[in-house]
Amino acid sequence: MMPPVRGTLTEGRPLADLTWLRVGGPADWLFQPADEEDLAGFLAAHDPAVPVFPMGVGSNLIVRDGGLRAVVIRLGRGFNGIRVEGERVIAGAAALDAHVARRAAEAGRDLTFLRTIPGTIGGAVRMNAGCYGSYVADHLIEVRAITREGRAVTLPAADLGLAYRQSRLPEGWVLVEAAFRADAGDPAALARRMDEQIARRDSSQPTRDRSAGSTFRNPAGFSSTGRADDTHELKAWKLIDEAGMRGARRGGAQMSEMHSNFLINTGGATAADLEGLGEEVIKRVFQSSGIELQWEIMRVGEEPVNKQ
């Protein structure tokens, strides 16, 4: 029995069309809360034995073909506001990273590193996303979240344990807002920088294909702040190339010919195709270099019960 809500609660909702890779089975339930009060009330009344899984726009996610035995919580309107208050940029967890970068730039504040990061602010904080030498950890002041028990809490960035592509946000907590500190900048200059970033991305990454962004973490040096050495020679794509896996295929899944650290759905791929190809890449890279790549794409859910 699910608690009453003012938002939308759907049983057996397929998730494939909510992910960038367009694969995956159904969630037991999909909850799209109307606002913070609706979200908090639902979590407070929800059976603690039933898992919850916060989901953004599915940009960094493989949902397995058997679906997800959980309540998937997907924030939308009511959670995507953006405002600038002096040096602070406050964004709802459902705000797109690109929109936050643009809104900040219009106000003369520099969060340009977010412009080419796919997904939402909630996911960017949870994964300590970064680009062009800047990371969420470098700018984050604090976050607001709803706990699994339905309590609203505010946490300083230092309490999140932000590191390279990870955080220690407790399982089941739902981020609702994040505040960033952003340096001042000329709006026109910031806009030009973002245009250059987009051009650079589009010339080197398969942005026209169905992908989930970078597939594996770079095995480069990094510190507890999340800063990575972007000039480090040890890049995941180089290791993949050296293992002969650029362009490798399994079913409808392929390691992109354009950028070999991008796993793409060429059409008709299953989650098993995509994850299986990724695991084969890990195996081949380890055989070639002795280095074990780590997934950057999150994989969740179960295999189909009738899997042979």
Curated annotation (Swiss-Prot):
Against Pfam families, the record matches this protein to:
FAD_binding_4, MurB_C
- EC number, as in UniProt: 1.3.1.98
Instruction: Cite a single GO MF annotation.
Output: UDP-N-acetylmuramate dehydrogenase activity
The pathway to which it is assigned is: Cell wall biogenesis; peptidoglycan biosynthesis
Q: Which segments carry the region annotation Disordered?
A: 197-228
Which keywords does the record carry? Answer: Cell cycle, Cell division, Cell shape, Cell wall biogenesis/degradation, Cytoplasm, FAD, Flavoprotein, NADP, Oxidoreductase, Peptidoglycan synthesis
- What is the annotated localization of this protein? Cytoplasm
The chemistry this enzyme catalyses reads: UDP-N-acetyl-alpha-D-muramate + NADP(+) = UDP-N-acetyl-3-O-(1-carboxyvinyl)-alpha-D-glucosamine + NADPH + H(+)
From start to end residue, where is composition biased (Basic and acidic residues)? 197-211
Give cofactor(s), names only: FAD
Where does the source fall among the domains of life?
Answer: Bacteria
Biased composition annotated in UniProt, kind: Polar residues: 212-226
The principal localisation class reads cytoplasm
Active site annotation, chain numbering:
165, 214 (proton donor), 296
Q: Which InterPro entries match?
A: FAD-bd_PCMH, FAD-bd_PCMH-like_sf, FAD-bd_PCMH_sub1, FAD-bd_PCMH_sub2, MurB, MurB_C, MurB_C_sf, Oxid_FAD_bind_N
Provide one Gene Ontology biological process annotation: cell wall organization
SUPFAM superfamilies on file: FAD-binding/transporter-associated domain-like, Uridine diphospho-N-Acetylenolpyruvylglucosamine reductase, MurB, C-terminal domain
Q: What cellular-component terms does GO give this entry? A: cytosol
Q: Which residues form the FAD-binding PCMH-type domain?
A: 22-185
Q: Which NCBIfam families does the entry mention?
A: murB, PRK13905.1
- Job of this protein: Cell wall formation.
**What family name appears in the similarity comment?**
Belongs to the MurB family.
Q: What is this protein called?
A: UDP-N-acetylenolpyruvoylglucosamine reductase
| Source organism of this protein record | Cereibacter sphaeroides (strain ATCC 17025 / ATH 2.4.3)
Gene that specifies this protein: murB
